[in-house]
Regions:
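HTH-adjacent hinge/linker in prokaryotic transcriptional regulators
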Residues: 2-88, 101-105, 112, 123-127
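Conserved phosphate- and dinucleotide-binding cores of soluble alpha/beta proteins
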Residues: 3-10, 17-19, 32, 38, ...
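Residues at secondary-structure transition points
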Residues: 65-69, 73, 94, 106, ...
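A general structural motif
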Residues: 85, 106-108, 191, 217
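Structural signal for interior beta-strand "rungs" in well-ordered beta-sheet cores
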Residues: 88-89, 105, 118, 220
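Short glycine/serine/threonine-rich phosphate/pyrophosphate-binding segments
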Residues: 96-99, 205-206
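A short acidic, amphipathic alpha-helical/loop segment
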Residues: 99-102, 233
Length: 244
């Protein structure tokens, strides 16, 4: 939990060889002690001293370190989809940050992002037209959010949008453990194609807030460790799955 910020009951039951009922009882005890807050199917670490929200998403540095090898392959595959003359939207996140790094030598493209680290990196490339969403800074993820950020996406016509995920499944689409995350939904109408970039560990992790329904996603790029069950589930949707 310290590393990922959240845990799922079914994962803990497998790790500790205990029943889900026992795990739920333990999480209930920890909630009473003020260590975690529970949600349906799991729990999140309470971040003391942070007024933004009690149940926070994993910080940017922690995200960047997790599953780094698969994320690099995923980012490289995403970069290959971006061609000269394109306009691209990058949502905030560790995998989309790797995409930004992969665009450091790109020429004649436009990148729109709410990610401060991505914007800082891309600002070094004078051959990129960089558009940064305004709004309120969410310090944990170093990204821009709120109504100002969402309004800045109006009248944008991008070729591709890249979005990460805390969790994804074929029924609920992309979900998050963070409250009030709505900017991804504002990005979708501005893009002709929506591409989710996430490592296979994110499959069947379900946050309590939906970011994007599965119907809004055109392509998922993930690593080759994704299960056959998840592949079959996605075959029943309109989503194209790319494994790397």
């Amino acid at each position: 939990m310290n590393e990922q910020g959240t845990v799922l009951v079914q994962d803990l039951a497998g790790v500790f060889a205990a029943s889900e009922a026992t795990i739920r009882a333990d999480l209930r005890f920890l909630e009473q002690k003020g260590v975690v807050t529970r949600f349906h199917g799991g729990a999140a670490k309470i971040m003391s001293g942070n007024s933004e929200t009690e149940t926070q998403e994993v910080g940017f540095k922690e995200r960047f370190q997790l599953a780094s090898a698969p994320k690099n392959r995923i980012a490289q595959a995403a970069v290959k989809m971006i061609h000269e003359g394109m306009t691209v939207i990058l949502d905030s996140g560790s995998t989309t940050m790797l995409i930004a790094e992969g665009l450091m030598t790109a020429k004649n493209i436009t990148v729109i992002t709410n990610s401060l680290p991505a914007a800082f990196a891309l600002s070094e490339n004078k051959d990129i037209t960089l558009v940064v969403c305004g709004g309120t800074v969410r310090h944990k993820t170093r990204s821009m959010h709120g109504s100002i950020a969402e309004r800045s996406l109006q009248d944008i016509n991008a070729d591709l949008m890249f979005v990460g995920a805390d969790g994804i499944d074929a029924v609920n689409g992309i979900t998050t453990f963070n409250e009030g995350y709505s900017i991804s939904g504002a990005m979708v109408p501005a893009a002709n194609k929506v591409i989710a970039v996430l490592d296979s560990s994110k499959f069947n992790r379900r946050g309590f807030n939906q970011v994007l329904p599965i119907e809004k996603i055109d392509i998922i790029i993930t690593d080759d460790a994704v299960s056959e069950v998840d592949k079959l589930a996605l075959q029943k949707t309109r989503v194209k799955l790319i494994t790397v």
